[in-house]
Structure formats: structure tokens, C-alpha cells
């Protein structure tokens, strides 16, 4: 199954969770914080402006992004994988390099 987000929404595959702290302590799955990074796997057509024009999104498939800890509250399971669906304005930055 493939998701096609509408308008200014994007679908993100969350990065793998860290299971160790910086000090080397192994965290159980329930204590590990979910990462706020991921890769965009699908984008919508763009934001519809008040005048009816469509503004293309500033992100594209394959971009690695950072989002807020409470962003992407819409999680969808596709082919056994949890994907996040969020609006483009919930993305804080694109990771370059």
C-alpha cells in the first residue's frame, strides 16, 4: 500500500530509536525517547492559498528532516511500518550534508 498525502501534508519515516544514552546506558524500549528526525517518503501537492493558487512544498521525497517532539501525532501503519503524517509547517529544519 502507498500513501499519497493531500495538500501541504508529508509522510515521514521516523529514524531508528537510540537505545543507549550518551553515557552508554542501555535504555529499555519504553524508556527510550522517540527520535524527532526522519526521512520524507511522500509529499502532497502543496498548500492551497486564499486566492486559489497552489504553493509547492519546500521539502521533497528523500529529505532528512527534524520536527518537534509533539509533531506528527497522526501515525499510520503501512505494510507493518509506522509512518508519520504531518503538515509541512510542523517540520523545523532540513538536514543537509
Swiss-Prot record:
The principal location of this protein is cytoplasm
Where is this protein localized, as stated in its record? Answer: Cytoplasm
Q: Name one GO biological process term.
A: chaperone cofactor-dependent protein refolding
**Per the record, GO CC terms?**
cytoplasm
The record, for PANTHER family, names: 10 KDA HEAT SHOCK PROTEIN, CO-CHAPERONIN GROES
Which protein family is named in the record? Belongs to the GroES chaperonin family.
> Quaternary state and partners of this protein?
Heptamer of 7 subunits arranged in a ring. Interacts with the chaperonin GroEL.
Q: Which NCBIfam families match?
A: PRK00364.1-1, PRK00364.1-2, PRK00364.2-2, PRK00364.2-4
Described purpose of this protein according to its UniProt entry? Together with the chaperonin GroEL, plays an essential role in assisting protein folding. The GroEL-GroES system forms a nano-cage that allows encapsulation of the non-native substrate proteins and provides a physical environment optimized to promote and accelerate protein folding. GroES binds to the apical surface of the GroEL ring, thereby capping the opening of the GroEL channel.
Q: What is this protein called?
A: Co-chaperonin GroES
Its source organism is Pseudomonas putida (Arthrobacter siderocapsulatus)
Amino acid at each position: 500500500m502507498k500513501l499519497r498525502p493531500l495538500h501541504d501534508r508529508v509522510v515521514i519515516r521516523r529514524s531508528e530509536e537510540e537505545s543507549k544514552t550518551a553515557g552508554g546506558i542501555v535504555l529499555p524500549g519504553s524508556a527510550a525517547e522517540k527520535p524527532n528526525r526522519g526521512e520524507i517518503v511522500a509529499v502532497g501537492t502543496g498548500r492551497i492559498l486564499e486566492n486559489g493558487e497552489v504553493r509547492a512544498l519546500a521539502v521533497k521525497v528523500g529529505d532528512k528532516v527534524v520536527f518537534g517532539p509533539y509533531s506528527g501525532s497522526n501515525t499510520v501503519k503501512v505494510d507493518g511500518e509506522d509512518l508519520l503524517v504531518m503538515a509541512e509547517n510542523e517540520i523545523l529544519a532540513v538536514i543537509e550534508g
